Regions:
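Class I SAM-dependent transferase core
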Residues: 60-154, 165, 170, 185, ...
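Compositionally biased, intrinsically disordered low-complexity segments enriched
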Residues: 13, 21-23, 33, 69, ...
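Bacterial N-terminal signal peptides
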Residues: 40-57
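SAM/dcSAM-binding transferase cores
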Residues: 3-4, 9-22, 28, 60-68, ...
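Bacterial N-terminal signal peptides that target proteins for export
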Residues: 20-45
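Conserved nucleotide-cofactor-binding alpha/beta core module
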Residues: 146-264
Length: 282
């Protein structure tokens, strides 16, 4: 009889163990279901930081795309950074983060053909015969500034406002000058709409800079003069950089570093920008 009693006790213990396991399974399943979106997003982030582009499992990619707002175009921005920028030796994490954050398509005209190329590595036409620079050049010039923490930056040539938005993700204050009144107005309105309240846009001639707000921790020019405007060097803080495309038919990005004993310059990358207008025309 003792073995029968033991058998009954064993059966009862097994039954209780199964019941506990079933309860745990139900709790885990409910918890997993309620947190599935968080889990998937975390997994997507892990893969995006470590995997080769295109290597994500299709099931994960499809689920993320279904949950994302199609107007955000987040995946396109991520691909732009990975394929066009990081692979070409732009490595500053603040610059990469800014390029992945700013919605470039919002700064491109609302035309189907142009919108389809909003994240292609190419300049695109905007209003008033001007262009929005290709993403790689924006990232390259931003990184070349080597901005310190809490930087104050001067931009010459607001254009669409895209470069200013990228700078605003990194710098504390951005001062941007646009000589075309229509572009100054539209870029200011769009930047305000997107929440970039640390960008200050004014209409004016960029050759003279913005002396009231000098000195700056960096100056960037997004149109090409045939010479470097002296005022822009004067308005640099000591140790700060001016990044500017220089030339007429053939242009190259020139980096000028202001030093106590003067300034030094380095010519780096051949480029093609729209001409800088203003003082030089008079």
């Amino acid at each position: 009889m003792a073995w029968r009693t033991t058998l009954v006790k064993t059966q009862l213990l097994n039954t209780e163990w199964r019941q506990r396991q079933n309860r745990r399974t139900l709790v885990f399943r409910d918890h997993f279901r309620s947190n599935r979106n968080k889990f998937t997003l975390a997994l997507w982030t892990l893969f995006s930081l470590t995997a080769i582009p295109g290597s994500l499992p299709p099931s994960i990619s499809v689920e993320i795309k279904a949950q994302a707002n199609p107007n955000d175009r987040v995946t396109e921005r991520r691909d732009m950074v990975v394929r066009q920028i990081r692979r070409r030796d732009v490595t500053n994490p603040l610059v990469l983060s800014a390029m992945e954050t700013v919605p470039r398509h919002r700064f491109v005209p609302n035309d189907a053909s142009l919108q389809s190329r909003a994240y292609a590595d190419t300049p695109l036409p905007i209003d008033q015969g001007q262009t929005i620079s290709q993403p790689y050049i924006v990232a390259y010039m931003t990184e070349a500034l080597q901005l310190p923490p809490n930087a104050r930056v001067l931009e010459i040539g607001t254009g669409s406002g895209y470069q200013a938005a990228v700078l605003a993700e990194i710098a504390t204050e951005v001062y941007s000058i646009e000589i075309v009144p229509e572009l100054a107005t539209t870029s200011r309105e769009l930047l305000n709409e997107l929440g970039y309240d640390n960008v200050h846009v004014r209409m004016g001639d960029g050759y003279g800079g913005w002396p009231e707000e000098a000195p700056f921790d960096g100056v960037i020019v997004t149109a090409a003069p045939d010479h470097i405007p002296p005022a822009l060097i004067e308005q640099l803080a000591e140790g700060a950089r001016l990044v500017i495309p220089v030339g007429e038919t053939y242009q190259a990005i020139t980096i000028v570093t202001k030093q106590a004993a003067g300034s030094s310059s380095e010519v780096t990358l051949p480029v093609r920008f729209v001409p800088m207008t203003g003082e030089a025309e008079r």
